[in-house]
Amino acid sequence: VSTMNAKTSSGGEEEASGMRNETLGEAKRRQVIYVAYMIAALDLTFLFMQMGIMPYLAKSLGLDSVGFGYLQTIFGVLQLVGGYIFGRFADQFGARAALILSCASGSIFFLLMSLSTSIPLLFLSRLPAVFMHGMPGAQKVITDMTAPSQRAAALGRLGLCFGVGIIAGSAMGGVLSTKFGIYVPTYVGLVGSLINTLIAMVWIPSQTKPKSDHHMTEHSTSRSGSLFSITEILRLMKFPGVMEVFIVKVFAGLPIGLFMIMFSIISMDFFGLEAVESGYLMSYFGVLQMVVQGLVVGKLASHCTEMTLLRLSVFVFAGVGLGMALMRTVWHYCIIAVPLVFAFSMLATITDSILTKAVPSSDTGAMLGICASVQPLTRTVGPTIGGVLYKQFGVSSFGYLQLVVNLGLFVYLLKSKIPLGDVKS
């Protein structure tokens, strides 16, 4: 009987694999995934490039620190609102259409930014950010085109793109704005985003899902046609394990997210760093991100269960919190950064993998959109909460908050029996 079951299981896997290969072919599928990585790397490079010059551009136009805070909050709110809508769009119209929308929105974003010669125009340039979701778009392509067993490792490699974006974007923004003028990086971002749009149009196929999943998608979209629906979000959260894992995803990284939002001020006031030294520190983070995602996350994902890795990332986060509470110099922070980047990368990769496997394939885009909204949510509420923590209790408060929250989550994960399974129908 066990032999028959094994054969049946093997036959089912071969049939599923055959459907996937029938859609595009193995070599073509790998090529499309590599193109998705390239689009994500370029998109993040341009994003970090504009983030580097934005404070200087805002200051040159006469915007004070309070106004700049409003500008950042608007960007966060737009990304927060657009994340889920973008995911639903990807489910209904395909990953290719979603990536084209993201890259085209990026082009409009940089065009408006290049024309921002006044404060109102600078605020107006934030509007296209509602559809600028290159990373979730690439995640959608990879989710559609990888088997569940390979998904965590494939999504983890996107962290390499993040590292490339931090290093290349920060460096390009600084060099171009210093040598050629503050608006030159926006011209580069405009041209680069247009090229990214063409790459998505030419190299990403119109249908990235296996044929069986494509029929499910058509059924799903006919059932719920609107791009934004609270009912649909609640429906996704009711799948086994989804709400529990999503809560861990939000709260485990929230304290460190607050710290990173305040980091520009902390680096000046607490560490006493100059702008150039802060840039070096960001590059160090980028290198760590690439090493961890390229050499560690994928290998651990292939040898350990996802629940084990989720618990590990939360436990390491708790240790990072203790280190942050005790740190006094930038060298302490450089040491803490190693487990910090590991926990951050592992948590993001594993939770995305678990959540996309826990919902039907016709809803993976919406689920990725919800996941992508976590960071903008932190950016929206972060300046207020982070500012109060820093002003009233100092840098150590971020560490103690990180320690307490993640110890609580670790105990919760040890005691709870979260059902983790592939729910594809």
Language-model features: locations:
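Juxtamembrane intracellular "pre-TM" segments in multi-pass secondary transporters
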Residues: 13-30, 206-247
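Cytoplasmic helix-loop-helix junction between adjacent transmembrane helices
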Residues: 125-163
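Residue-level signature of mid-helix packing/kink "hotspots" within the transmembrane helices
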Residues: 76-84, 166-167, 286-294, 379-380
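Helix-to-loop junctions at the C-terminal end of transmembrane segments
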Residues: 83-94, 177, 292-305, 390
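Structural signature of the two symmetry-related core transmembrane helices
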Residues: 97-111, 308-323
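Hydrophobic core of transmembrane alpha-helices in multi-pass small-molecule transporters
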Residues: 41, 109, 120-133, 332-346
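Conserved MFS/SLC helix-loop-helix module at the cytosolic interface between two early adjacent transmembrane helices
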Residues: 81-117
